[in-house]
Amino acid sequence: WYKSISRSIIIAALQYKKVDIFGFSTGGLLALLSTKKDYQEFVSVVCINAALHLNDLRIKTLLPAISFWNDIVKAFNSEKYTKEYVDNFPENIEVNYNKHYITSIEQLSLLMVKTRKILPKIKKPILIIQGKDDPVVNSSSAHEIFENIESRYKSLKIIEAKSHVIVNNKNTEELFQTILEFINKGEK
């Protein structure tokens, strides 16, 4: 994931004088992590429902147990007993996966840890947007990001929403207006 966004930033930096990085959910974490690359063209970050804390208790409780189980059965060369995924029941079945693969959840957990570590080093202007009643990402994520980044130009916007995918619901006009105002402010 991180290599993909890094390549995209390099390509954008070669094409444009100013690059704003946007990320939604896991992409929000990747956008934050991408600030490690301090390109001159990189002017700001917008993260939407950045997945620093998840509401799904299975991630905190079940994942470590499944990972431990998988390690044990692999140690005995019994890979056929490993659990590769947990079922997911997404709100947007047309765009979300119906399975959470254990390896991808482990990667997301690592990304959360790495992102937390770099928060105090983020100095770029940043807009943090969070859906108030997001069923996937705990709203404490947005507050933790806001409180821990060093940027002097930071803004936190909580949007009334009961869904995770707020980029295509009834509040999109408010969401996009907030983003546009943030970007326009940075261009002055």
Where are these regions (language model features)?
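Conserved acidic catalytic loop of the alpha/beta-hydrolase fold
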Residues: K3-D20
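Gly/Ala-rich beta-loop-alpha elbow adjacent to hydrolase catalytic centers
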Residues: G23-G27, A31
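Active-site nucleophile loop of the alpha/beta-hydrolase fold
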Residues: V46-D56
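Active-site nucleophile elbow and catalytic-triad environment of alpha/beta-hydrolase enzymes
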Residues: Y101-I118
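Short beta-strand/loop motif that positions the catalytic acidic residue
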Residues: I122, I128-Q130, D134
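Short alpha-helix in the alpha/beta-hydrolase fold that links the catalytic acid
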Residues: K124, N138-E147
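Catalytic histidine neighborhood in serine/cysteine hydrolases
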Residues: H143, E147-V165
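Catalytic active-site module of serine/aspartate enzymes centered on a nucleophile-bearing elbow/loop
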Residues: E160-K188
